[in-house]
């Protein structure tokens, strides 16, 4: 039986949840119906579940969600991960910090030149967008991301996430991945596989 580890993006990213319904809560309900019948187990770390509950009102689905999806955090204090993963992560973060610094310097020079900046607000907005893109895209950038990654690694599970950085780093440590655009079809296939053959 396959084990699937869920990230909030499955339920909050429109490109992913639109496979099920236009509304995120309705999409979650349909996901749960399919997951309940699938020959699979579903997990979500506690930190990710809390994040999800803050983003979406699950009052009507909380009991259903918790009866289908197991809420379990990774065993952070006993789990062993390859040291190369940590080495690469630190190298990547350092590289991104340096790139972010160059972006900040570029915008500081633009602001210092007389007559080049008509709208300081627009300059700051542009700086924030470029800085955020440089530092966060394609990397695990939160405790919740790490919890999902570690739990998938620990359980030898399949990662379900629309987060490109999380998928990239999961692949580095050998975690199985399903692309988010295939989620509904995979669930339907697992549902049909669990039915007895005639």
From Swiss-Prot:
<dbReference type="InterPro" id="IPR029060">
    <property type="entry name" value="PIN-like_dom_sf"/>
</dbReference>
<dbReference type="GO" id="GO:0001682">
    <property type="term" value="P:tRNA 5'-leader removal"/>
</dbReference>
<keyword id="KW-0378">Hydrolase</keyword>
<keyword id="KW-0255">Endonuclease</keyword>
<dbReference type="InterPro" id="IPR014856">
    <property type="entry name" value="RNA_free_RNase_P"/>
</dbReference>
<comment type="function">
    <text>RNA-free RNase P that catalyzes the removal of the 5'-leader sequence from pre-tRNA to produce the mature 5'-terminus.</text>
</comment>
<comment type="similarity">
    <text>Belongs to the HARP family.</text>
</comment>
<dbReference type="Pfam" id="PF08745">
    <property type="entry name" value="PIN_5"/>
</dbReference>
<dbReference type="GO" id="GO:0004526">
    <property type="term" value="F:ribonuclease P activity"/>
</dbReference>
<keyword id="KW-0540">Nuclease</keyword>
<protein>
    <recommendedName>
        <fullName>RNA-free ribonuclease P</fullName>
        <ecNumber>3.1.26.5</ecNumber>
    </recommendedName>
</protein>
<keyword id="KW-0819">tRNA processing</keyword>
């Amino acid at each position: 039986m396959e084990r699937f580890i869920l990230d909030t993006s499955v339920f909050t990213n429109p490109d992913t949840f639109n496979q099920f319904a236009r509304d995120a809560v309705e999409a979650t309900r349909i996901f749960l119906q399919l997951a309940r019948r699938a020959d699979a187990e579903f997990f979500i770390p506690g930190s990710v579940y809390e994040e999800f509950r803050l983003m979406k009102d699950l009052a009507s689905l909380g009991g259903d969600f918790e009866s289908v999806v197991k809420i379990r955090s990774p065993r952070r204090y006993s789990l062993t991960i390859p040291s190369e993963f940590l080495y690469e992560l630190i190298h990547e973060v350092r590289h991104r910090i340096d790139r972010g610094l160059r972006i900040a310097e570029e915008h500081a020079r633009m602001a210092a030149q007389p007559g080049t900046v008509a709208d300081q607000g627009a300059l700051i907005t542009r700086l924030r967008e470029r800085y955020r893109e440089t530092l966060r895209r394609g990397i695990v950038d939160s405790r919740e991301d790490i919890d999902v990654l570690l739990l998938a690694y620990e359980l030898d599970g399949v990662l379900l996430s629309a987060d490109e950085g999380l998928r990239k780093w999961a692949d580095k440590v050998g975690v199985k991945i399903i692309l988010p655009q295939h989620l509904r079809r995979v669930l339907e296939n697992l549902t049909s596989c669990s039915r007895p053959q005639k």
